[in-house]
Amino acid sequence: MPPSLSHLFLLSTFASLALCSFYCKNPGYPCLNGGTCLYNGECNCTSGFRGFNCGLDSSTISAACTVECHNKGICFNGDKCYCTKDYMGPTCQQAYDFADCNKSSMKIKAYRPTEFNGEIFLMQSMFGCKLTEVTSTIPGYKQYELDVPHDSTGPCKLKKTIDATTGDVHFEVNVSTIHHAGQFGMYDGLKTVSCHYSSRDQAIVKDVTNHELLVSVTTSDGNTQNIQEIQTNDVIHLTFNPVNLPGGYKGVKILDLEMYSVQWNEVNSILLLKDQCMTQKADELGYSVSNEVDGYSGRAILKAIPLFENVQASVYFNYRLRFCRNRCKIKSCPSQSPKPMPMGEIFKHQGQGIRIV
């Protein structure tokens, strides 16, 4: 007999989460004009406003405009441009991430909101190849730069390819942004910045955010079999395996872990781990979360408990990790308070007891 819906626990880890450059839960990326930040990092705008951050008043959109808005920007008030999430500037001409393709070097540049307190670095080295903050040329934004010579042989070396037919030279590098210093989360980004030397075109920036480039995530049962559905109260092993970490790093451990589910436009979520330790709420609800390291991998072991009662709904996980130079160590967490025994009724034992000797 197939299990009833109340006993079926579906897993859909990470696959449907949209990875983008705007995530309203990151510092410096608020929803404007009364908009609400949703569980997936997108803004739900109030009536009359639109745009990725609800920053555009629909009543001000102009059919006729005295300026040209680039990169799919929208003209409003007749002479101003509302930009998409990847561009900025008076006419949306400036990308947040770009490079100056100089004769002998590639100067990588990035703009971030003034509230940004994270780090931007080349994937080869989180510490040796950081972009440093400089005086910003655009008010209201921080500006970061790193100038890398074409012939660099150090940790910040560029990837160089030469077209055998045309002789064109191509340089590229992967640039990572993390919004919390020393940590990596679901909505931190990775972009490829490149310079192509033939007609000296503007640098090309491609969003290649795919967290499987850094870590692979697997869900399995206690027998290490990969799973997509599991019985309620069975055990889930959620493992983060390092794949291509920034230079100098080998291990991964879990800092924060959140589980959530969406049903009928309602979101239920629970924070399972905070700063490496099981939360009191998770303990009270019986999730029994264990945070471990297995070699160089980080692993959370938890009990499968649905977030909606009597409903077959997939669950998703959001996470924040820390990379380690070798095998990670999990800090010692305080023990949760013992639960008081009920005294108002006679105990009714379920099943055969276990004798501890």
From Swiss-Prot:
GO terms for cellular component: cell surface; extracellular region. Prismatic layer of shell (at protein level). Expressed primarily in the mantle with highest level in the mantle edge and lower level in the mantle pallium. It is found in: Secreted. PANTHER family: EGF-LIKE-DOMAIN, MULTIPLE 7, 8, VWFD DOMAIN-CONTAINING PROTEIN. Disulfide bonds join 24-37, 31-43, 45-54, 65-75, 69-81, 83-92. Residues 21-55, 61-93 form the EGF-like domain. The keyword Secreted applies. Its main location: secreted. This is EGF-like domain-containing protein 2.
